[in-house]
Curated annotation (Swiss-Prot):
The lineage of its organism: Bacteria, Bacillati, Cyanobacteriota, Cyanophyceae, Synechococcales. The keyword Iron applies. HAMAP family: IspG. It is an enzyme of class 1 (oxidoreductase). Gene3D superfamilies: Dihydropteroate synthase-like, Sulfite Reductase Hemoprotein, domain 1. This is 4-hydroxy-3-methylbut-2-en-1-yl diphosphate synthase (ferredoxin). Pathway: Isoprenoid biosynthesis; isopentenyl diphosphate biosynthesis via DXP pathway; isopentenyl diphosphate from 1-deoxy-D-xylulose 5-phosphate: step 5/6. Its cofactor is [4Fe-4S] cluster. Its EC number is 1.17.7.1. Keywords: 4Fe-4S, Iron, Iron-sulfur, Isoprene biosynthesis, Metal-binding, Oxidoreductase. Pfam families: GcpE (PF04551). It catalyses: (2E)-4-hydroxy-3-methylbut-2-enyl diphosphate + 2 oxidized [2Fe-2S]-[ferredoxin] + H2O = 2-C-methyl-D-erythritol 2,4-cyclic diphosphate + 2 reduced [2Fe-2S]-[ferredoxin] + H(+). [4Fe-4S] cluster binds at C306, C309, C340, E347. One of its GO terms (biological process) is isopentenyl diphosphate biosynthetic process, methylerythritol 4-phosphate pathway. It comes from Synechococcus sp. (strain CC9902).
Length: 401
């Protein structure tokens, strides 16, 4: 398939990557795109952290990240893992390590399934306000120090067959990268590639990469450039997508979707996190909605509904609400609710079932493209349920919990 053909293809073709196991969850192009989040409890609060992780898992989270800013926090991860195991919860855990984190990472690697490091902070020198440039020798000297500091962690993760996320943040690039490449996607990519090349030299390949920024255009550019750079150098590591510091409410969700969905539609991305300034479990439905909207994972009913107009023969918003309340537990179905017969039958043709205004007070029920029966509007929702039951696709809500 040519690039032009791919541009107009209705199927998303994912960038081919290797598989990286994070605990029991595979990340890579041959597997469903994994959904993850991060608790906001203090890691030293063992009970609170365990409760937060379980809330995320109950919401559908598949990988959970936990902050580990000190050795004490790293050791607490062992207790958290044990408490979760005792409760029958074996969700993969990721430790988040930042400033000068070698000792922390070496400790926490014993207790988790993946370690996330930030290349801009892993070997951290306080910026010098009087510095005018970085010479090649100064740049190389810090690179040598990074390798010496990073190598023990890579070897430990390799021995334990655990995973690493090289997680670049646009807002925390190292001073030498800023001087050399500027505050740019190129600087983000080179920051990650420095660590990728060290891992490759040490024959360690359980790597996932992220290139997060708080502005979607920067994030989009960085991920695209990262994928291209890896392709050029022969690397095929999976990508973790996210827009960092997206905020809250509708705008936070829209901002995250603008970045994440755009890349997913281009075939980039193997695991995602929507970062909201809200309870972490509220991030999870947004992730699944993004994936379903692109046809990448189907975990809920797909509702197709017109926006309503003067031709609409019933209160579309109220009816859609009633249909959703009655059927939202039927995962995997497509149900269309259309206001009239002008566009309804054609626009809902791909749906499993259709509920269409046929005339004043009358609705028609469809199975695919076939009209099955007409019923009074007041009986419409129950008649839809009956049709689904006749086809053997109905389950009671309690059975899906």
């Amino acid at each position: 398939m040519t690039a032009l053909d791919r541009r107009y293809d209705t199927q998303i073709h994912r960038r081919v990557t290797r598989t990286v196991m994070v605990g029991s969850v595979p990340i890579g192009s041959e597997h469903p795109i994994a959904v993850q989040s991060m608790i906001n409890e203090d890691t030293l609060d063992i009970d609170g952290s365990v409760a937060g992780i379980i809330r995320l898992v109950d919401a559908g989270c598949e990988i959970v990240r936990v902050t580990t800013p000190s050795i004490g926090h790293a050791k607490a991860m062992g207790k958290i893992k044990a408490e979760l195991s005792a409760k029958g919860c074996n969700v993969p855990l990721v430790a988040d390590v930042h400033h000068n984190g070698t000792k922390i990472a070496l400790e926490v690697a014993q207790h988790v399934d993946k370690v996330r490091i930030n290349p801009g902070l892993f070997v951290f020198d306080k910026p010098d306000p009087n510095r005018q440039e970085f010479t090649e020798s100064e740049f190389a000297e810090i690179g040598t120090r990074i390798r010496e500091t990073f190598e023990p962690l890579v070897k430990l993760l390799r021995e334990q067959n655990k995973a690493l996320r090289i997680g670049v943040n646009h807002g925390s690039l190292a001073e030498r990268m800023l001087f050399t490449y500027g505050d740019t996607p190129k600087g983000m990519v080179e920051s990650a590639m420095e660590f990728v090349r060290i891992c490759d030299d040490l024959d360690f390949h359980n790597i996932v990469i992220s290139m997060k920024a708080s502005r979607a255009p920067v994030m989009l550019s960085a991920y695209r450039l990262m994928a291209d750079t890896m392709d050029q150098e022969g690397f095929n590591y999976p990508l973790h997508l996210g827009v960092t510091e997206a905020g809250d409410g509708d705008y936070g969700r829209i901002k995250s979707t603008a970045g994440i969905a755009t890349l997913l539609a281009e075939g980039l991305g193997d695991t995602i996190r929507v970062s909201l300034t809200e309870a972490p479990e509220k991030e999870i439905p947004v992730c699944y909605s993004i994936l379903q909207s692109l046809g990448l994972r189907k975990t809920m009913v797909e509702y197709i509904a017109c926006p309503s107009c003067g031709r609409t023969l019933f209160n579309l918003e109220d009816v859609l609400h009633k249909v959703r309340n009655a059927t939202s537990h039927l995962k995997g179905l497509d149900i269309a609710v259309m206001g009239c017969i002008v566009n309804g039958p054609g626009e809902m043709a791909d749906a499993d079932y259709g509920y269409v205004g046929k005339g004043p007070g009358i609705i028609a029920l469809y199975r695919g493209r076939e009209e099955i029966r007409k019923v009074p509007e007041k009986e419409g929702v129950q008649a839809l349920i009956q049709l689904i039951q006749e086809d053997g696709l109905w389950v009671d809500p309690d059975e899906t919990r």
